[in-house]
Structure formats: C-alpha cells, structure tokens
C-alpha cells in the first residue's frame, strides 16, 4: 500500500494499486464499452438456462447496434426486440415483477417505485445489484401490492412488468448470474480472435475484484480498511479524510489537502470541507467536539460503510495473492498440491479470523502476502468494534465464463456476449479482453 497516489495516472496504475497486477491476455483489443448507455446490457439469469429479456432496447438488423425506440436512428431499420417475460397467476403475499432500467442505480430505481406505491425499502426484495451506467433487467418482489398497481407505474427510463404472485421475498443470491451483451468501440478487431481464444482455452478469467469494489473515482476503501483491521483509528480516519485522487472535484481535493497540512484543526476543516462530503463532515463534527475520540468518530459512519472498508481490504489481499499465484505460473483452473478446492477449482482466501490457509506453494504465497502487509488472520477480529469483524472466506481463483461469443459489426466495433455466475464481475472479463482503459465508467 506504499504507493504515491500522484503516480496513479492511468487505470492500469489504479488496478495495480488495488492488487490487480497480472493478466492472461497480454494484448487486448483496446477500445471503450461505455460510449453509450446502450453499449452495456445486463440481463439477470434466474437459472443457467434462462434470462430476463430486455424490451427497452432493440437491435438494428442493419448496423448491429442497440437502440431505444422502434427504428434505428442511423439507418432507419425496424429494431428487433425481445418479447416480454411470460406472466402467471400464482399465490402469495408478494408480487414478482421485472424491473428494466436505463442509467439508474438499482436501489434508487426501487426507491422511486416505492414512492409511487407508498412502500418502504424493506417491502422490496432483489436477487442482486445491477450496473448503473447500463440498460438492465432483473426480478424484484414487493410485499402487499397487487399486480394491477404495478401496471400504473410511469417513471422516466424505468419499465415495470408484473409477472404474478409469489410466497416469498427475493433475497440476495437468488439468481444463477447475469447475461451481458456489450458493444466495444474504437477497438483493434484484429486482436479479438486471439483474446477470445486465450479466454476460452483457460475456461474463464482471473477472478479479481474489480476497481469498482474499491471506489472507481476514489479507490481508498482498502487503504482505510487496513488501518481498521489494525485498529489504528486515527490513521484510518486520516486516510479517509485526506487521501486525494485526481478524479475527484477540485473542491474536494483542496479540502483534503488543507486538512492534511493542518491535521488536528477539525473545526477549521468544517469550514473548508464542502457540504456534499457528508460522511467526512460527520466525522469532523465529532472530532471538533472530542478531538482524540477517533474510534467513536469512526462509528459516526453507517454500519454498512464501516463493513465495506474491511471487505475492501480483504478483497485487496485476495487480489494480491491471486496476482502472485499467476506470477509464479500456478494454474487457475486446476488445483496443485496444497490447494483448498471448491467445485473442482483452487481457491484464494478472503482473510478473516476463521480463515484456513492452504498448504504447499499456494500456502506459501498466502502467508508471504499477509506477512508483507503486516497482518494476521486474527487481526480481523476487531475487538474495539466487534460488529465489523470478519470471519473470512475463500473464493475460486478462476471466474468461469459461459456462452462466450463475439461478432465484429464494423471496422473498429464488435459485440461480445457472455454469462457470468453470481458474484462475477464483468469488468474482470473485460479487462482481459480489452485491457483496463475504457472498461470503467466515470
């Protein structure tokens, strides 16, 4: 973690900062997959053989692009659109519906629907979050609302289609995974065939946690998480408040720089920190009253944010261990002596106080990374804030990529279609196919 953030000039630099140091595809296609919202389509897969179709967009049979509306704005062709998911009657206290959204955060879209229905967050259930800067489809349940009421919802860039009644609420993880249809522009299409071949030959891609896990605009969560795990609360708060990144606003950068140069003047910092940095101001308000009470200042953050810091540091350690495994040439899809295996795949630890480390060379890698970081599994039992302690887990080294295909639709444009099981990051696949630049949305 001893990196000068001023050196993080490219997304490749940022990837290395969060532990993603290796790739299996040495020369990707380049390009961008975020030029248009319609370039990134995500469809939930309840099972391996089914997916929730998107009706908000259709494909032009002429140019191959995806658009909203009925006709292609470029060539005038009638767009080919999917049919609605079939509805059914059913019984139960929850109504299952399809949510399609265009450039909406998942929970903001659900809350907007909740306002229309006069229902709070806890009435809704979802199986998983979907990308914001994308067109997405997924199932949602809502308690105590008849299907007819859902048909009356009219919100810009949201389509709601009731399916029927069910007995239980959808819960996180109630899905097989997601299907992706992604258009990559300004690409070197000559490199596409080789990149696809490498990924298919491996059976997937390294199962890294992508940059968005750490904060795409300000990837500071794992840095804070390290000091949370070490229970160095002043250092954790110092990094959270003062660590600046070039993709932040000038106002935020100036405030962080001022506090770094005037550490301890928390009343003065409240005059400098802008109102939109509300979590930072919560901490500063506490420290202005109780200057050395860092642990309770940190408690001013919501529980889920405090947990997020610990999870981010676990993810960073996972990425570093996976990178070192690749650097040493150990296989990702086949176990070697000493590996801890799940579903036939070698696993990498998300370290925690209950974590079992591997033996042999895989275990040597795991222990050496923890030693370099100066942490032990027992450190994740956080005695001064036990509610954010982490028992740990293990996760496969390889992310299986299913139903992978690609089609070149112009001299520098291609469409790639693939499915990932739940927990898999599309960015992990795309950074291999394309390289890091152009993968992450602003």
Regions found by a protein language model. Give the residues of each.
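Extended, charged/glycine-rich binding lobes that contact polyanionic ligands
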Residues: 1-94, 101-107, 112, 116-417, ...
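Pseudouridine synthase
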Residues: 424-428
């Amino acid at each position: 973690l001893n990196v000068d953030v001023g050196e993080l000039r490219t997304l490749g630099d940022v990837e290395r900062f969060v532990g993603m140091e290796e790739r299996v595809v040495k020369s990707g296609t380049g390009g961008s997959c975020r030029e248009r919202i319609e370039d990134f389509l995500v469809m939930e897969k309840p099972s391996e053989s089914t997916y929730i179709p998107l009706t908000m967009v259709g494909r032009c049979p002429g140019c191959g692009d995806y658009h909203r509306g009925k006709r292609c704005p470029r060539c005038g062709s009638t767009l080919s659109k999917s049919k609605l998911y079939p509805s059914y009657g059913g019984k139960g206290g929850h109504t299952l519906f399809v949510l399609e959204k265009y450039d909406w955060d998942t929970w903001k879209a659900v809350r907007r629907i909740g306002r229309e229905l006069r229902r709070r967050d806890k009435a809704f259930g979802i199986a998983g979050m979907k990308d914001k800067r994308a067109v997405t489809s997924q199932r949602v349940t809502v308690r105590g609302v008849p299907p007819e009421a859902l048909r009356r919802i009219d919100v810009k860039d949201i389509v709601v289609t009731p399916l029927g009644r069910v007995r239980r609420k959808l819960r996180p993880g109630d899905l097989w995974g997601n299907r992706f249809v992604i258009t990559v522009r300004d690409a070197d299409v000559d490199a596409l065939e080789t990149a696809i071949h490498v990924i298919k030959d491996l059976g997937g891609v390294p199962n890294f946690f992508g940059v968005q896990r750490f904060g795409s605009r300000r990837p500071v969560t794992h840095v804070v998480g390290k000091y949370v795990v070490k229970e160095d609360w002043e250092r954790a708060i110092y990094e959270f408040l003062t660590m600046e990144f070039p993709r932040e606003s000038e106002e935020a950068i100036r405030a962080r720089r001022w506090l770094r140069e005037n550490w301890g003047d928390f009343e003065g910092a409240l005059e400098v920190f802008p109102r939109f940095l509300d979590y930072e101001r919560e901490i500063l308000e506490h420290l202005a009253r109780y200057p050395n009470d860092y642990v309770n200042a940190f408690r001013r953050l919501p529980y889920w944010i405090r947990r997020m810091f610990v999870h981010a540091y676990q993810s960073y350690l996972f990425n570093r261990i996976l990178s070192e495994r690749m650097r040493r040439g150990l296989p990702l899809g086949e176990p070697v002596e000493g590996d801890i295996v799940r579903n036939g795949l070698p696993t990498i630890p998300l370290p925690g106080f209950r974590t079992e480390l591997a033996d042999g060379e895989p275990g040597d890698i795991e222990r050496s990374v923890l030693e370099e970081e100066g942490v032990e599994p027992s450190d994740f039992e956080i005695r001064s804030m036990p509610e954010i302690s982490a028992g740990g887990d293990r996760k496969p080294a390889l992310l299986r990529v299913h139903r992978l295909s690609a089609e070149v639709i112009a001299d520098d444009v291609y469409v790639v279609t693939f499915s990932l099981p739940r927990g898999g990051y599309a960015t992990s696949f795309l950074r291999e196919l394309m390289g890091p630049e152009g993968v992450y949305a602003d």
